[in-house]
């Protein structure tokens, strides 16, 4: 996943029409989550009809193999041959706003643990294994339906007006997992978690791609993926420790607070960037 993500995101940025980058990333996320929805649905049906876990995992290999066979058919736009560069971050110059954004992103990622904790939480609230699969299906469908509209809204109204609510939704959803206990409330939370995924995925990648130097777009998107990867590793270790020591609510209190704090910090960073651009234009 780490190898494919940055080149894929750079390819989307390169192929997108001007002014439609958020919608392009939204389209990618819609297709991604639609596939995830089908996977969750088939997993539910396999288990419901008595199939063991190992054969179910083996069946999942088929779409992966088909996808790999399709990739060579993709043709990139022809242009000037890229210059050979050393793989180093030392000479990479990033906008100060993007550096601060990455710092806040890593802070947020420390509270954004694996989705497996959401499923374990649902199971601890009385959902059966098959019902937990349906909850994941509901989350995936919600994210898939909202991904394109959220991306297009970020193209029209600006990235910050989608990103800030997205991070706030995350914080409130995680606090909801800590506070709410009924099955209906958890069902609503999984729908809202899908909305968070849709709001963030397109707008955030578009923001980073637009703020990156053209010749280093893939590299910067790789840094973005690296921060998310390390954040997921550390956050899952933290969440597991909190769960074992203080109970199943603790990781969600931690993640919820970090989500809301991150939303406020992102609002400050992006507003400061807008103010600086306005001052530059007046000069």
Features from the language model and the residues they span:
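Intracellular juxtamembrane helix-capping segments at the cytosolic ends
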Residues: 4-16, 199-212
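Helix-to-loop junctions at the C-terminal end of transmembrane segments
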Residues: 47, 146-158, 243-244
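Structural signature of the two symmetry-related core transmembrane helices
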Residues: 61, 161-176, 256
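Juxtamembrane intracellular "pre-TM" segments in multi-pass secondary transporters
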Residues: 76-104, 283
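Helix-loop junctions on the cytosolic side of multi-pass membrane transporters
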Residues: 63, 71-85, 268-279
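Cytoplasmic helix-loop-helix junction between adjacent transmembrane helices
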Residues: 1-32
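Symmetry-related core transmembrane helices of the 12-TM Major Facilitator Superfamily/SLC fold
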Residues: 55-72, 252-268
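Short amphipathic helix-loop junctions that connect adjacent transmembrane helices
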Residues: 116-132
């Amino acid at each position: 996943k780490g190898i494919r993500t940055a080149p894929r995101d750079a390819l989307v940025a390169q192929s997108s029409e001007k002014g439609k980058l958020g919608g392009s990333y939204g389209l990618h996320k819609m297709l991604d989550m639609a596939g995830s929805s089908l996977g969750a649905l088939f997993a539910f049906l396999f288990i419901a009809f008595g199939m063991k876990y190992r054969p179910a995992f083996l069946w999942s290999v088929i779409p992966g193999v088909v996808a790999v066979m399709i990739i060579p058919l993709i043709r990139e736009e022809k242009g000037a041959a890229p210059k050979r560069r050393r793989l180093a971050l030392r000479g990479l110059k990033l906008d100060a706003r993007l550096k601060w954004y990455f710092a806040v992103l890593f802070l947020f990622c420390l509270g954004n643990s694996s989705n497996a904790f959401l499923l374990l939480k649902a199971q601890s609230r009385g959902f059966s294994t098959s019902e937990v699969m349906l909850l994941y299906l509901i989350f995936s469908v919600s994210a898939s339906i909202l991904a394109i509209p959220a991306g297009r809204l970020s193209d029209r109204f600006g990235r910050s007006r989608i990103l800030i609510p997205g991070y706030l939704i995350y914080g409130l959803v995680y606090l909801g997992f800590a506070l709410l206990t009924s099955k209906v409330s958890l069902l609503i939370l999984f729908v809202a978690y899908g909305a968070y995924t849709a709001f963030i995925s397109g707008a955030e990648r578009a923001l980073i791609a637009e703020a990156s130097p053209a010749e280093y777009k893939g590299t910067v998107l790789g840094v973005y993926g690296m921060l998310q990867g390390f954040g997921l590793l550390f956050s899952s270790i933290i969440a597991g420790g909190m769960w074992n020591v203080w109970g199943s609510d603790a990781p969600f209190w931690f993640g919820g607070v970090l989500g809301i704090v991150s939303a406020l910090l992102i609002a400050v960073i992006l507003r400061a960037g807008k103010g600086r651009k306005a001052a530059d234009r007046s000069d």
